[in-house]
Design a protein with these regions (language model features):
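Amphipathic N-proximal alpha-helical interface segments
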Residues: 4-11, 33-105, 109-179
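N-terminal targeting signals for Sec/Tat export/insertion, comprising classic cleavable signal peptides
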Residues: 15-39
Length: 179
């Protein structure tokens, strides 16, 4: 997937979708209702919907859409995509390639790298390696490799590459929710 044509987060496409689009342009209302996830945020202001191996996906195995609760147009405020790996080194290799492209595209944006423990793994053996770009309009883009411990892999957790686009509105929600 080429990222170099985008100047604004709404110009980025993941599986043809962009921030600000209606999810109804890509999924039926039944699909949207059937794919609602349990809220993982401190409040339910935004709804999470995960879609696995959908017929129109060309690059990613899973796409995650977040929209405001009670938004009957399902306007996408956050859009994520994931690939799953048996070998974390494959994830790191693809992450590195994406970061090289993003470094060129967002050369004037603030960039941050963070390695942190996955809160679900109480042993502290699972990590996320995240590079985040802060765009001038308040939106953000993250490229993350999640490296689950062997014990979590055996429970069905797969190492994954995640590319996440967040509107300013969604980024502000997360900043307040987790401050």
């Amino acid at each position: 997937q080429s990222w170099t044509q985008a100047d604004d987060i709404r110009d980025f496409k993941i599986e043809g979708m962009s921030i600000g689009d209606s999810a109804l342009d890509y999924f039926s209302e039944k699909e949207l209702k059937d794919n609602k996830q349990a809220t993982q945020y401190p409040n339910d202001k935004f709804i999470i919907r995960n879609f696995y191996l959908h017929s129109f996906f060309e690059t990613y195995e899973m796409v995650t859409v977040n929209h405001k609760k009670n938004d009957n147009k399902y306007i996408i405020e956050s859009l994520g995509a994931s690939l799953f790996f048996d070998d974390i080194e494959e994830c790191f290799s693809i992450q590195k390639k994406i970061i090289i492209e993003f470094d060129q595209t967002f050369e004037n944006s603030e960039k941050d790298f963070e390695r942190f423990k996955k809160s679900l793994d109480k042993t502290g053996s699972s990590y996320s390696n995240m590079t985040e770009y802060y765009l001038s309009n308040g939106s953000a883009i993250q490229v993350t490799c999640d490296d689950w411990s062997k014990a979590f892999n055996e429970q069905g957790f797969k190492d994954s590459l995640n590319v996440n686009l967040q509107s300013k509105k969604f980024k502000e929600f997360l900043d307040i929710a987790y401050d």
